[in-house]
């Protein structure tokens, strides 16, 4: 039989509980905000990209759900402003590939410099695949895992056991239904795989090989959805059976900054160690810069956290403090039951 929660404890315990809820709420809001924010930025600079035309270099932003353009409209009067049609662009803007679309009228509907394509063009000369082909399973599932964490945090803020299980059950059911409908019923998985295959074959035309990659993406994404549903079931059962299991509902989301860095570094390693032999220039496999400044040939690289990563750190810090406070409460409850 589970020990009764300390909802009727003294003023000190009630104050602790309110603090736990406040910290968890701050963490929840910070993580939701981080999903829509750039987490990391990377920039390339070189002599052939003058600072007047490219004040931030060739810059891209990594979000939890993909890679976005990091270049902004040029300052009026600068070289870039004089030579191109200017406008800030985002992931929904029509794009032109500077290699494959060389014969197109690039001024038609032009919106300015797209640094994602610019960096892809630079990278393909050494045999690197387009950046957006990285994390092809993680990106479309990111929103569901963030929702999974949000439900756990919401439940962690609830002290009463039945209410907590209800929050977990309803929340997890909603996330599972959302994932299934989004990926399979609405066909977003199929459209994602199609876009992945097209992007992967942008520079290196090996249709059979790349289609096999697309099939793997479809398979692993289905496995990912299954793992997500299984993880939700394990959490619900764990909270139902074990009192101390509730601490994992704060610990796992608190590790999000670590998860991101490991994922980011792993995919950088993949890109640097899986260079296509058709690249115009031959370079040895290398590890791109994860944090700080580096140099590859004439290019200087810069890789640093963006404000979205700070939001993840805020969420992590709040959750760890809330976890320690809740752990202290659980120990007090255990000691009281033995007295």
Predicted regions and their residues:
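Short, Lys/Arg-rich, polar N-terminal cytosolic tail immediately upstream
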Residues: 1-14
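Alpha-helical transmembrane segments and their helix-start/interface "positive-inside/aromatic belt" motifs
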Residues: 14-31, 159-176, 240-255, 322-325
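Hydrophobic alpha-helical membrane-insertion segments
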Residues: 28-39, 168-187, 248-274
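Long, glycine/tryptophan/cysteine-rich extracytoplasmic
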Residues: 36-139, 182-218, 265-306
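Hydrophobic alpha-helical transmembrane segments
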Residues: 138-157, 174-177, 219-236, 310-320
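Membrane-proximal helix-loop-helix units in multi-pass membrane proteins
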Residues: 163-171, 187-253
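Membrane-interface capping segments at transmembrane-helix boundaries
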Residues: 324-335
